[in-house]
Amino acid sequence: MYKRQTPEEALAILSNNQNDKQKRIDTVLQEGYPSYTTAAGWLGYSDEKIIQLCREYMAKGWKHFKIKVGLDLDADVKRLELIRKTIGDDCFIMVDANQQWNVEQSIKHINAYKKFNLFFVEEPTSPDDVMGFAKIKKEVGNVRLATGEACGGRIMFKQFLESGAMNICQIDSCRLGSINEIITVLLMAHKFNVPVFPHAGGVGLCEYVQHLCMIDYILINGSKNDKVVEYQDSLHEHFIYPVSYTHLTLPTRRGG
Protein backbone atom coordinates (compact mmCIF):
# COMPACT_ATOMS: atom_id res chain seq x y z
CA MET A 1 0.00 0.00 0.00
CA TYR A 2 2.96 2.32 0.50
CA LYS A 3 3.17 2.88 -3.27
CA ARG A 4 -0.31 4.36 -3.19
CA GLN A 5 -0.31 6.03 0.20
CA THR A 6 2.53 6.32 2.66
CA PRO A 7 2.05 6.57 6.42
CA GLU A 8 3.29 10.15 6.17
CA GLU A 9 0.57 11.02 3.63
CA ALA A 10 -2.11 9.45 5.81
CA LEU A 11 -0.87 11.35 8.86
CA ALA A 12 -0.89 14.59 6.88
CA ILE A 13 -4.55 14.09 5.93
CA LEU A 14 -5.51 13.53 9.56
CA SER A 15 -3.39 16.44 10.78
CA ASN A 16 -4.73 18.90 8.21
CA ASN A 17 -8.28 18.34 9.43
CA GLN A 18 -7.56 19.09 13.08
CA ASN A 19 -7.98 22.87 12.97
CA ASP A 20 -11.70 22.93 12.14
CA LYS A 21 -12.60 19.49 13.49
CA GLN A 22 -14.80 20.92 16.25
CA LYS A 23 -16.77 22.89 13.70
CA ARG A 24 -17.62 19.69 11.82
CA ILE A 25 -18.54 17.93 15.06
CA ASP A 26 -20.93 20.78 15.83
CA THR A 27 -22.36 20.54 12.32
CA VAL A 28 -23.23 16.85 12.53
CA LEU A 29 -24.60 17.27 16.04
CA GLN A 30 -26.95 19.90 14.66
CA GLU A 31 -27.67 18.60 11.16
CA GLY A 32 -26.72 14.92 11.07
CA TYR A 33 -25.41 13.21 7.92
CA PRO A 34 -27.69 12.98 4.86
CA SER A 35 -28.97 9.59 3.70
CA TYR A 36 -30.83 8.02 0.80
CA THR A 37 -33.64 5.48 0.91
CA THR A 38 -33.68 2.13 -0.86
CA ALA A 39 -37.26 1.34 0.08
CA ALA A 40 -39.27 2.93 -2.72
CA GLY A 41 -38.28 0.95 -5.80
CA TRP A 42 -37.70 -2.74 -5.23
CA LEU A 43 -38.21 -5.02 -8.24
CA GLY A 44 -41.73 -6.42 -8.33
CA TYR A 45 -43.42 -3.36 -6.87
CA SER A 46 -46.49 -2.17 -8.75
CA ASP A 47 -46.60 1.33 -10.20
CA GLU A 48 -49.16 2.30 -7.58
CA LYS A 49 -46.94 1.10 -4.73
CA ILE A 50 -43.90 2.92 -6.12
CA ILE A 51 -45.84 6.19 -6.37
CA GLN A 52 -47.21 5.75 -2.86
CA LEU A 53 -43.79 4.99 -1.34
CA CYS A 54 -42.05 7.83 -3.17
CA ARG A 55 -44.62 10.27 -1.85
CA GLU A 56 -44.38 8.85 1.68
CA TYR A 57 -40.60 9.13 1.77
CA MET A 58 -40.62 12.60 0.26
CA ALA A 59 -43.02 13.64 3.03
CA LYS A 60 -40.49 12.33 5.57
CA GLY A 61 -37.80 14.51 4.02
CA TRP A 62 -35.89 12.27 1.65
CA LYS A 63 -34.55 13.68 -1.60
CA HIS A 64 -32.45 10.71 -2.79
CA PHE A 65 -34.10 7.48 -3.99
CA LYS A 66 -32.30 4.28 -5.00
CA ILE A 67 -34.20 2.09 -7.45
CA LYS A 68 -33.55 -1.52 -8.42
CA VAL A 69 -33.10 -2.21 -12.14
CA GLY A 70 -31.68 -4.87 -14.39
CA LEU A 71 -34.28 -7.41 -15.50
CA ASP A 72 -35.81 -5.69 -18.53
CA LEU A 73 -34.64 -2.48 -20.19
CA ASP A 74 -38.06 -1.28 -21.33
CA ALA A 75 -39.58 -1.97 -17.91
CA ASP A 76 -36.69 -0.16 -16.21
CA VAL A 77 -37.16 2.91 -18.39
CA LYS A 78 -40.90 2.92 -17.68
CA ARG A 79 -40.30 2.73 -13.92
CA LEU A 80 -37.69 5.47 -14.04
CA GLU A 81 -40.06 7.71 -16.01
CA LEU A 82 -42.75 7.08 -13.38
CA ILE A 83 -40.40 7.83 -10.49
CA ARG A 84 -38.95 10.97 -12.07
CA LYS A 85 -42.47 12.26 -12.73
CA THR A 86 -43.45 11.50 -9.12
CA ILE A 87 -40.46 13.01 -7.31
CA GLY A 88 -39.74 15.85 -9.73
CA ASP A 89 -36.44 17.30 -10.88
CA ASP A 90 -35.35 18.58 -7.47
CA CYS A 91 -34.88 15.05 -6.11
CA PHE A 92 -32.25 12.51 -7.08
CA ILE A 93 -32.45 9.00 -8.54
CA MET A 94 -29.75 6.36 -8.29
CA VAL A 95 -30.08 2.83 -9.63
CA ASP A 96 -28.71 -0.52 -8.46
CA ALA A 97 -28.43 -3.39 -10.95
CA ASN A 98 -27.06 -5.92 -8.42
CA GLN A 99 -24.52 -7.28 -10.95
CA GLN A 100 -27.23 -8.29 -13.46
CA TRP A 101 -25.35 -7.41 -16.66
CA ASN A 102 -22.17 -8.17 -18.53
CA VAL A 103 -20.03 -5.27 -19.69
CA GLU A 104 -21.76 -4.67 -23.03
CA GLN A 105 -25.23 -4.91 -21.46
CA SER A 106 -24.14 -2.46 -18.78
CA ILE A 107 -23.11 0.10 -21.38
CA LYS A 108 -26.40 -0.33 -23.27
CA HIS A 109 -28.60 0.01 -20.18
CA ILE A 110 -26.72 2.91 -18.59
CA ASN A 111 -26.73 4.92 -21.81
CA ALA A 112 -30.50 4.35 -22.05
CA TYR A 113 -30.91 5.78 -18.53
CA LYS A 114 -28.91 8.96 -19.13
CA LYS A 115 -31.99 11.10 -19.73
CA PHE A 116 -33.01 10.59 -16.09
CA ASN A 117 -29.90 12.39 -14.82
CA LEU A 118 -28.92 9.60 -12.45
CA PHE A 119 -27.01 10.35 -9.26
CA PHE A 120 -25.07 7.11 -9.74
CA VAL A 121 -25.32 3.56 -11.12
CA GLU A 122 -24.46 0.82 -8.63
CA GLU A 123 -22.88 -2.56 -9.44
CA PRO A 124 -23.86 -2.87 -13.11
CA THR A 125 -21.62 -5.93 -13.50
CA SER A 126 -19.43 -8.33 -11.52
CA PRO A 127 -17.82 -6.50 -8.57
CA ASP A 128 -14.54 -8.34 -9.26
CA ASP A 129 -14.24 -7.12 -12.85
CA VAL A 130 -12.11 -4.02 -12.41
CA MET A 131 -11.23 -3.76 -16.09
CA GLY A 132 -14.88 -4.30 -17.01
CA PHE A 133 -15.86 -1.36 -14.83
CA ALA A 134 -13.11 0.71 -16.45
CA LYS A 135 -14.49 -0.09 -19.92
CA ILE A 136 -18.04 0.74 -18.84
CA LYS A 137 -16.86 4.04 -17.40
CA LYS A 138 -15.11 4.92 -20.65
CA GLU A 139 -18.29 4.27 -22.66
CA VAL A 140 -20.89 5.99 -20.45
CA GLY A 141 -19.22 9.36 -20.02
CA ASN A 142 -20.04 11.35 -16.92
CA VAL A 143 -22.39 8.79 -15.34
CA ARG A 144 -20.90 7.86 -11.97
CA LEU A 145 -20.30 4.19 -11.22
CA ALA A 146 -20.63 2.98 -7.62
CA THR A 147 -19.22 -0.27 -6.29
CA GLY A 148 -17.33 -1.75 -3.37
CA GLU A 149 -19.90 -3.46 -1.16
CA ALA A 150 -18.58 -6.84 -2.31
CA CYS A 151 -14.89 -5.95 -1.92
CA GLY A 152 -13.30 -7.83 0.96
CA GLY A 153 -10.07 -5.87 1.36
CA ARG A 154 -8.09 -2.74 0.55
CA ILE A 155 -6.31 -4.30 -2.45
CA MET A 156 -9.53 -4.52 -4.47
CA PHE A 157 -10.26 -0.89 -3.64
CA LYS A 158 -6.71 0.02 -4.65
CA GLN A 159 -7.26 -1.56 -8.07
CA PHE A 160 -10.60 0.18 -8.60
CA LEU A 161 -9.23 3.56 -7.52
CA GLU A 162 -6.00 3.33 -9.51
CA SER A 163 -7.84 2.36 -12.69
CA GLY A 164 -10.41 5.15 -12.38
CA ALA A 165 -13.18 2.54 -12.58
CA MET A 166 -14.87 3.61 -9.34
CA ASN A 167 -16.52 7.02 -8.98
CA ILE A 168 -18.23 6.26 -5.67
CA CYS A 169 -16.66 3.99 -3.07
CA GLN A 170 -19.21 1.80 -1.29
CA ILE A 171 -17.41 0.18 1.60
CA ASP A 172 -19.20 -2.61 3.44
CA SER A 173 -18.18 -2.52 7.08
CA CYS A 174 -18.75 -6.25 7.59
CA ARG A 175 -16.92 -7.49 4.51
CA LEU A 176 -13.89 -5.28 5.16
CA GLY A 177 -13.54 -6.95 8.50
CA SER A 178 -12.15 -4.30 10.83
CA ILE A 179 -12.18 -0.59 11.51
CA ASN A 180 -8.45 -0.51 10.67
CA GLU A 181 -9.11 -1.83 7.16
CA ILE A 182 -12.01 0.59 6.74
CA ILE A 183 -9.93 3.62 7.74
CA THR A 184 -7.23 2.53 5.28
CA VAL A 185 -9.80 2.55 2.47
CA LEU A 186 -11.28 5.89 3.62
CA LEU A 187 -7.82 7.47 3.48
CA MET A 188 -7.04 5.94 0.10
CA ALA A 189 -10.36 7.06 -1.40
CA HIS A 190 -9.69 10.58 -0.15
CA LYS A 191 -6.30 10.59 -1.86
CA PHE A 192 -7.96 9.66 -5.16
CA ASN A 193 -10.74 12.22 -4.59
CA VAL A 194 -13.44 9.53 -4.65
CA PRO A 195 -16.36 10.04 -2.24
CA VAL A 196 -17.33 7.23 0.13
CA PHE A 197 -21.00 6.23 0.39
CA PRO A 198 -21.03 3.28 2.83
CA HIS A 199 -23.27 0.33 2.02
CA ALA A 200 -25.83 -0.29 4.76
CA GLY A 201 -28.25 -2.88 3.41
CA GLY A 202 -28.21 -5.32 6.31
CA VAL A 203 -29.25 -5.82 9.91
CA GLY A 204 -27.35 -3.36 12.08
CA LEU A 205 -25.30 -1.91 9.22
CA CYS A 206 -27.02 1.47 9.41
CA GLU A 207 -26.15 1.63 13.10
CA TYR A 208 -22.50 0.85 12.27
CA VAL A 209 -22.33 3.08 9.22
CA GLN A 210 -23.38 6.20 11.12
CA HIS A 211 -20.03 6.02 12.93
CA LEU A 212 -18.04 5.48 9.72
CA CYS A 213 -19.53 8.41 7.83
CA MET A 214 -18.84 10.66 10.83
CA ILE A 215 -15.20 9.48 10.94
CA ASP A 216 -14.84 10.20 7.23
CA TYR A 217 -16.44 13.64 7.49
CA ILE A 218 -14.84 14.84 10.72
CA LEU A 219 -11.34 13.36 10.43
CA ILE A 220 -10.59 12.56 6.79
CA ASN A 221 -12.63 14.09 3.98
CA GLY A 222 -14.00 17.14 5.74
CA SER A 223 -17.02 17.60 3.47
CA LYS A 224 -20.62 16.40 3.21
CA ASN A 225 -21.23 18.09 -0.14
CA ASP A 226 -22.84 15.77 -2.69
CA LYS A 227 -22.67 12.84 -0.27
CA VAL A 228 -25.30 10.52 1.13
CA VAL A 229 -25.20 7.27 3.04
CA GLU A 230 -27.55 4.33 2.57
CA TYR A 231 -30.54 4.02 4.86
CA GLN A 232 -32.58 0.82 4.79
CA ASP A 233 -35.61 0.63 7.04
CA SER A 234 -34.90 -2.86 8.36
CA LEU A 235 -35.18 -4.19 11.93
CA HIS A 236 -34.14 -0.95 13.64
CA GLU A 237 -36.63 -1.73 16.40
CA HIS A 238 -34.16 -4.28 17.77
CA PHE A 239 -31.57 -1.60 18.59
CA ILE A 240 -31.52 0.51 21.74
CA TYR A 241 -30.36 3.57 19.80
CA PRO A 242 -31.57 3.10 16.20
CA VAL A 243 -30.57 5.48 13.43
CA SER A 244 -33.01 8.24 12.50
CA TYR A 245 -34.73 9.04 9.21
CA THR A 246 -33.19 11.14 6.41
CA HIS A 247 -30.13 12.27 8.40
CA LEU A 248 -27.99 9.93 10.50
CA THR A 249 -27.13 11.60 13.80
CA LEU A 250 -23.92 11.68 15.79
CA PRO A 251 -24.35 9.32 18.76
CA THR A 252 -24.38 11.11 22.11
CA ARG A 253 -24.46 8.05 24.39
CA ARG A 254 -22.30 4.97 24.81
CA GLY A 255 -23.58 2.19 22.60
CA GLY A 256 -25.39 4.70 20.37
Task: State the predicted function of each range.
Residues 1, 12-16, 111-113, 142, ...:
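Short, charged low-complexity intrinsically disordered segments located at boundaries
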Residues 43, 128, 152, 176, ...:
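A broad, structure-centric signal for solvent-exposed, well-ordered loop/edge residues
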Residues 26, 122, 176, 226, ...:
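Generic secondary-structure boundary/loop-capping signal
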Residues 67-207:
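Catalytic core of soluble alpha/beta enzymes
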Residues 3-93, 98-107, 111-116, 241-248, ...:
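N-terminal capping/lid subdomain adjacent to the active-site entrance of alpha/beta enzymes
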Residues 38, 170, 230-231:
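Structural signal for conserved beta-strand scaffold positions within catalytic alpha/beta enzyme cores
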Residues 43-48, 140-142, 217-226:
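Short, charged helix-to-loop "capping" segments that act as catalytic/coupling loops
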Residues 180, 184-185, 202-248, 253-256:
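Flexible C-terminal active-site loop/helix
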